[in-house]
Amino acid sequence: MAYPANYRYTREHEWIEIDGKTGTVGITDYAQNSLGDIVFVESPKVGDKIEKGKVFGSVESVKAVSDLYAPVSGTVTAVNEELANAPEKINTDAHTAWIMKIELSDAAEAESLLDATAYEAFVKEETGH
């Protein structure tokens, strides 16, 4: 699996693309592949305050329900409304089917996240391949 080099990643398999003080958040291709067919996405609401490492929503698949963990702290500025009617878009392209956009409280928080190379190594270590 290829992971976009300009994204940062969590060990819980979320990604964030940073653009100035705004971050776009989704789940990784590894996560969607592990979950299987996604049937529902619970997103936060615009205006919600999100704290790094805390649950901000969930993804439900035919196999399981998985919590989503915030890669950074901030205020939700947008949610991907398309996922309400078509959550399977995450299965089609996990790295463009974003879940929320967030105005970062502290851009430095993203520096502690994994880059693409480190995330790929983490996945290999976790899966044993």
Curated annotation (Swiss-Prot):
The modification N6-lipoyllysine is found at residue 63. One of its GO terms (biological process) is glycine decarboxylation via glycine cleavage system. PROSITE patterns: BIOTINYL_LIPOYL, LIPOYL. Its cofactor is (R)-lipoate. SUPFAM superfamilies: Single hybrid motif (SSF51230). Residues 22-103 form the Lipoyl-binding domain. Gene3D superfamilies: 2.40.50.100. InterPro entries: 2-oxoA_DH_lipoyl-BS, Biotin_lipoyl, GCV_H, GCV_H/Fam206, GCV_H_sub, Single_hybrid_motif. GO terms for cellular component: cytosol; glycine cleavage complex. Keywords: Lipoyl. Binds 1 lipoyl cofactor covalently. Pfam families: GCV_H (PF01597). The keyword Nucleus does not apply. The glycine cleavage system is composed of four proteins: P, T, L and H. Belongs to the GcvH family. HAMAP family: GcvH. The glycine cleavage system catalyzes the degradation of glycine. The H protein shuttles the methylamine group of glycine from the P protein to the T protein. This is Glycine cleavage system H protein. It comes from Acidobacterium capsulatum (strain ATCC 51196 / DSM 11244 / BCRC 80197 / JCM 7670 / NBRC 15755 / NCIMB 13165 / 161). The gene is gcvH.
